[in-house]
Amino acid sequence: MKRTRIEDDFNPVYPYDTFSTPSIPYVAPPFVSSDGLQEKPPGVLALKYTDPITTNAKHELTLKLGSNITLENGLLSATVPTVSPPLTNSNNSLGLATSAPIAVSANSLTLATAAPLTVSNNQLSINAGRGLVITNNALTVNPTGALGFNNTGALQLNAAGGMRVDGANLILHVAYPFEAINQLTLRLENGLEVTSGGKLNVKLGSGLQFDSNGRIAISNSNRTRSVPSLTTIWSISPTPNCSIYETQDANLFLCLTKNGAHVLGTITIKGLKGALREMHDNALSLKLPFDNQGNLLNCALESSTWRYQETNAVASNALTFMPNSTVYPRNKTAHPGNMLIQISPNITFSVVYNEINSGYAFTFKWSAEPGKPFHPPTAVFCYITEQ
């Protein structure tokens, strides 16, 4: 058999025909797998690889190594870097140290919240209730009405007429006759009352009535009503009514009867116990003070026994019975209008008017006999009234 002649340009490396363009991307022999291989450049069989596989300067296969990755003795090693809090390095594991309210849940970093904080749409937010509002990215109080802010940004109550803020208290700012202690009330004087229906009412006495227009008028009753003239005030009492040296140690009878511009006075006093039963001093003084309206002030005489003779009502506003402040100037004890009389051979009696800085006063003085009970005779005096 004759041997086939081989051409001079025959290439024994498959594919043998290097001048023809292959019709498929890989033209390796059918007994070679295309996995991991490629023809690059054409006609050259080469490995097909991607990062991190590469070749070194010696055209050897090797790996691209990043930070903290080393190749020692043919083995890859990872070096855990030095960390700073909150990162941790434990058993070659990188971790994150957390504290409340930060926690790790389901392998994720999360934020623990409590009302009114909440997480909504992956955002931390706050639930604002009534009276609160978020304005300009800030939580603020939503005031209305009389509430507002002062110049320091503090919440305040704006108080208008009739009210004021005193420290931490809201106070009614009232003038008399209003009074505000625990509640708003009215100060009532004689002639006024509050009815059971809560209305302010004028108290009408005998002979008075309301007309059809609600005005006070004299009653048109056919009965004749007489209003007694208050001409006498006295301190008559069946029991002790005067405290000179001790409580209720004397009984004082003082009677003032008005007649025009004059008042006739009668006075007697009797000691009942203690030092008044055996006098140690040779004189005794008793002062009865009154205010500018003629009301008896606190003194030796019990005020409940100082009454009008005609009605037996406690005497009040008895200005018409007071010593005239022009005739008897206040605190002028040597004024000639004062009286000094001899009421018995051994006892003298005097009365000084208006021995006081304001208001009115009677100052009665008796001489006394030491060692004997104090019971001087009745004395009579007269003076000009204020009205």
UniProtKB/Swiss-Prot annotation:
GO cellular component: host cell nucleus; viral capsid
Keywords: Capsid protein, Host nucleus, Host-virus interaction, Late protein, Viral attachment to host adhesion receptor, Viral attachment to host cell, Virion, Virus entry into host cell
Protein localization: Virion; Host nucleus
Primary localization: virion
Classification via Pfam families: Adeno_knob, Adeno_shaft
Swiss-Prot/TrEMBL induction comment: Expressed in the late phase of the viral replicative cycle.
InterPro entries, per database record: Adeno_fibre (IPR000931), Adeno_fibre_knob (IPR000978), Adenobir_fibre_prot_rpt/shaft (IPR000939), Adenovirus_pIV-like_att (IPR008982), Attachment_protein_shaft_sf (IPR009013)
Gene3D superfamilies in alphabetical order: 6.20.10.20, Adenovirus pIV-related, attachment domain (2.60.90.10)
Functional description taken from the UniProt entry: Forms spikes that protrude from each vertex of the icosahedral capsid. Interacts with host receptor CXCAR to provide virion initial attachment to target cell. Fiber proteins are shed during virus entry, when virus is still at the cell surface.
Free-text note on domains in this protein's UniProt record: The tail region anchors the fiber to penton base capsomers, whereas the shaft, built from several repeated motifs, allows the knob to protrude from the virion.
Note: All late proteins expressed from the major late promoter are produced by alternative splicing and alternative polyadenylation of the same gene giving rise to non-overlapping ORFs. A leader sequence is present in the N-terminus of all these mRNAs and is recognized by the viral shutoff protein to provide expression although conventional translation via ribosome scanning from the cap has been shut off in the host cell.
Subunit relationships: Homotrimer. Interacts with host receptor CXCAR. Interacts (via N-terminal tail region) with pentons.
Family, as annotated: Belongs to the adenoviridae fiber family.
Protein name from the UniProt record: Fiber protein 2
